[in-house]
Amino acid sequence: MFLRALLLSGLLAFSPLLTHAAPRTCLVVGISDGDTLTARCGRIGAYERVRVRIAAIDAPEKAQPYGQRSKQALSDLCFREQALITEIDTDRYGRTVADVSCNGEDVGSRMVSQGWAWVYDYNRLATKRGGGLFKLQDGARAKRLGLWADARPTPPWDWRKRQRAQQPHWGGFF
């Protein structure tokens, strides 16, 4: 009996680590780019600003072709709107990685289906969810929507790698 109680208390102690956080309703107060927003969550007098990276997508960077249009598409969908934010993880920049819905619509799905973001299968999240985002991406590509109007658009992860390679390296002399 004691062992069972000990095991149960251990599971309860770690259960928050095993599940996603409960969804939060927040107000979107800023758009950084096509896959990152800032939301104000909480109640009057106890607001918290949260930077949110939308899960399973990667949008063009602001200085990249289609970056500004991607940012505008996310703004049109979510800016000054209530968003349902379901936290999944925290990225290396301290942003909350989350599923986001605005006006009852999944934001990641919308951005991919309109051609403003690529599927980003970090930790195989998109694959584990059944691959629906990949089908939406294939549809946007076939219709040449958004960034798919280019014959060979550069994915943001390749663009960032090129940008880093072009940065001057001072070799620690200064």
Give the location of each predicted region.
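Small beta-barrel nucleic-acid-binding modules, primarily SNase/OB-fold domains
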Residues: 2, 7, 11-174
